């Protein structure tokens, strides 16, 4: 299509990055046909790559961004702008924050520019029924039009669902599913697809770990399930994996371990929605699969007795970098 053929990706990235150093909140108003081109071209790339990505370290893994564009720029300043580092994002790019459009446009532009070094998974907010309600639809309608929001929906319906890093680290947005017995089940999911109300795809995007649950439990979200530590241990053992890396929940320090450090939650939007005093974090995985955490501190000072950093896991050594 014409929008794709004449897409000047370098110019788009340059304009999106021009606001670095500006006061947070300054918008970048791309042309509508440029955004449409980003959606169409990235959709093509998503469909040309597997729904279950098989990735190699080294790479940096990021959790929810939720339209906090200036925090996304901070993450890149800290971790290195592509292609300096390889990246995997775990979903939830849009909704709640003020600049979902800039956020998703920069991420899609990097996907197009560096398709083998930059990866985006689907979060539960990359779904029309959710982002219709929580801000993205309204932002598209206010700044462009509803048709453009529908173009994003077509793109989101083609995002990959999960990734495995060096056959050892399983990554998805939400968590495990009682229906997940074999990785082949993920590979068999056909795209484009909406997110169903239940089942494997729904669970991978919506489920949560819960230390108080044995096996599977009801989820307070009213969608999917919660799962306990034993479910994690059994899953890792069965599939010869070391770690589950997921996002989907705000955690105070930007990262939080679960199940004897066999699962880690990453959340990359500091001061989430301006309502939380959380840090944001990014996990760096080196060639030896050593994991370390880079922290974006929240703007306000933390309370003096904030919890201590979590003890490093066995087998996967961690160190903490603060900024």
Curated annotation (Swiss-Prot):
Subunit and interaction comment: PP1 comprises a catalytic subunit, ppp1c1, ppp1cb or ppp1cc, which is folded into its native form by inhibitor 2 and glycogen synthetase kinase 3, and then is complexed to one or several targeting or regulatory subunits.
PROSITE patterns: SER_THR_PHOSPHATASE (PS00125)
One GO process term, biological-process aspect: protein dephosphorylation
A single GO molecular function term of this UniProt record: metal ion binding
Family (UniProt): Belongs to the PPP phosphatase family. PP-1 subfamily.
Keywords: Carbohydrate metabolism, Cell cycle, Cell division, Centromere, Chromosome, Cytoplasm, Glycogen metabolism, Hydrolase, Kinetochore, Manganese, Metal-binding, Mitochondrion, Mitosis, Nucleus, Protein phosphatase
The keyword Zinc belongs to this UniProt entry's keyword annotation: no
Binding site for Mn(2+) 2: 92, 124, 173, 248
InterPro entries noted in UniProt: Calcineurin-like_PHP_ApaH, Metallo-depent_PP-like, PP1_catalytic_subunit, Ser/Thr-sp_prot-phosphatase, STPPase_N
Catalytic residues identified in the record: 125 (proton donor)
Tagged with keyword Protein biosynthesis: no
Function: Protein phosphatase that associates with over 200 regulatory proteins to form highly specific holoenzymes which dephosphorylate hundreds of biological targets. Protein phosphatase 1 (PP1) is essential for cell division, and participates in the regulation of glycogen metabolism, muscle contractility and protein synthesis. Promotes nuclear envelope reassembly by targeting nuclear membrane vesicles to chromatin at the end of mitosis. Acts by dephosphorylating membrane proteins such as lamin B receptor (lbr) to regulate the binding of membrane proteins to chromatin.
Enzyme class: hydrolase
Reactions listed under catalytic activity: O-phospho-L-seryl-[protein] + H2O = L-seryl-[protein] + phosphate; O-phospho-L-threonyl-[protein] + H2O = L-threonyl-[protein] + phosphate
The protein's name in its UniProt record: Serine/threonine-protein phosphatase PP1-gamma catalytic subunit B
Compartments where found: Cytoplasm; Nucleus; Cleavage furrow; Nucleus, Nucleolus
Cofactor binding note from Swiss-Prot or TrEMBL: Binds 2 manganese ions per subunit.
Binding site for Mn(2+) 1: 64, 66, 92
Cofactors, names only: Mn(2+)
SUPFAM superfamilies, alphabetized: Metallo-dependent phosphatases (SSF56300)
A Pfam family per the record: Metallophos
Source organism of this protein record: Xenopus laevis
């Amino acid at each position: 299509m014409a929008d794709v053929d004449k897409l000047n990706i370098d110019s788009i990235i340059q304009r999106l990055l021009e606001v670095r150093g500006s006061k947070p909140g300054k918008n970048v108003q791309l042309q509508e046909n440029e955004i449409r081109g980003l959606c169409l071209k990235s959709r093509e790339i998503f469909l040309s790559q597997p729904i279950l990505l098989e990735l190699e370290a080294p790479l940096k893994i990021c959790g929810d961004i939720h339209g906090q564009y200036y925090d996304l720029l901070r993450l890149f300043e800290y971790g290195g702008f592509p292609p300096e580092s390889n990246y995997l994002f775990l979903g939830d790019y849009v909704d709640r924050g003020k600049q979902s459009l800039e956020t998703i446009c920069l991420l899609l532009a990097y996907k197009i520019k560096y398709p083998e070094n930059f990866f985006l998974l689907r979060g539960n907010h990359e779904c029309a029924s959710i982002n219709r309600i929580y801000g993205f639809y309204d932002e598209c309608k206010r700044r462009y039009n509803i048709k453009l929001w529908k173009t994003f929906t077509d793109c989101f319906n083609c995002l990959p669902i999960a990734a495995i890093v060096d056959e050892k680290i399983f990554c998805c947005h939400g968590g495990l599913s009682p229906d997940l017995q074999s990785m082949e089940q993920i590979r068999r999911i056909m795209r484009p697809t909406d997110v169903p109300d239940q089942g494997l795809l729904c669970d991978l995007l919506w489920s949560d770990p819960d230390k108080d649950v044995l096996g599977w439990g009801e989820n307070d979200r009213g969608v999917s399930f919660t799962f306990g530590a034993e479910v994690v241990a059994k899953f890792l053992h069965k599939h010869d994996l070391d770690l589950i890396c997921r996002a989907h929940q705000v955690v105070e320090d930007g990262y939080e371990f679960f199940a004897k450090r066999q699962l880690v939650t990453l959340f990359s939007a500091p001061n989430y929605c301006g309502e939380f005093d959380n840090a944001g974090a990014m996990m760096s995985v080196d060639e030896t699969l050593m994991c370390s955490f880079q922290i974006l501190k929240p703007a306000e000072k933390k309370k003096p007795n904030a919890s201590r950093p979590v003890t490093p896991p066995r087998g996967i050594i961690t160190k903490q970098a603060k900024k």
